[in-house]
Amino acid sequence: MFSRVIFCTFLILPLLAAATAIPRTNPPAPTCTTGSLQCCNSVQAASNPVVGLLAGLLGIVLGPITGQVGLTCSPITVIGVGGTSCSAQTVCCNGNSFNGLIVVGCSPVNISL
């Protein structure tokens, strides 16, 4: 009698284990609530001489900037729709964009697009 109980227990336990839900951890969505997501080929400090030279050639006065400066950027509108991809640095920028050549007030966002 006990052998049947033990046999049924060992038969049912794997089925219960297989039916147990597996918790999924989805990566957090990128947070860029204060600006816009940009895909920049390069992200530099505002004090970098290359940034100052490029800004000077374009006639842009940078002034005091918080964050970093994105160079050669394009906006990312909707993630996952229409083949949006960024093979460079994804940043969240809350400053001015000068035709995508220079975008000020950027901070890196760790997402994979």
UniProtKB/Swiss-Prot annotation:
GO cellular component terms given for this protein: extracellular region; fungal-type cell wall
Subunit structure: Self-assembles to form functional amyloid fibrils called rodlets. Self-assembly into fibrillar rodlets occurs spontaneously at hydrophobic:hydrophilic interfaces and the rodlets further associate laterally to form amphipathic monolayers.
Protein name: Class I hydrophobin POH3
Entries under Pfam families matching the protein: Hydrophobin
Signal peptide (residue range): 1-21
Cysteine pairs bridged by disulfides in the record: 32-92, 39-86, 40-73, 93-106
Tissue specificity statement from the Swiss-Prot or TrEMBL entry: Expressionn is switched off in the fruiting bodies but abundantly expressed in the vegetative mycelium of both monokaryon and dikaryon.
Keywords of the record: Cell wall, Disulfide bond, Glycoprotein, Secreted, Signal
Similarity field: Belongs to the fungal hydrophobin family.
Residues bearing attached sugar chains per UniProt: 110
Any GO molecular function: structural constituent of cell wall
Subcellular location: Secreted; Secreted, Cell wall
Gene name of the encoded protein: POH3
Chain segments annotated as coiled-coil in the UniProt record: none
Function: Aerial growth, conidiation, and dispersal of filamentous fungi in the environment rely upon a capability of their secreting small amphipathic proteins called hydrophobins (HPBs) with low sequence identity. Class I can self-assemble into an outermost layer of rodlet bundles on aerial cell surfaces, conferring cellular hydrophobicity that supports fungal growth, development and dispersal; whereas Class II form highly ordered films at water-air interfaces through intermolecular interactions but contribute nothing to the rodlet structure.
